């Protein structure tokens, strides 16, 4: 049995963010595990994702940390339903005049849009889950 390592991936360019998006597609996110800290300009997601980088297809608890976030908006997400499970499909990036718009696309047309000063996103694995259920 080989050693298993937890990863930390930092994105500072559009190409880097595409890699994080690919790693996190089909990740499960509980609505109560989404946090925006406006004073710190940080947006956090605690996700359960498949380890697509290995062949064993295990689940990993990870944190996606978006920094330098000026604002956050959501569409079609009930903020009062803390038990709602979202499935992250992709993370998209759009350049605006003086900033970036990061869009988190979830299944069933649910969207979170982040307005960022720069691209500074970290995907950090926390724990490998033995049980394949979310």
Over which residues does each language-model region extend?
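Surface-exposed, interaction-prone regions used to assemble/regulate multi-protein complexes
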Residues: 1-134
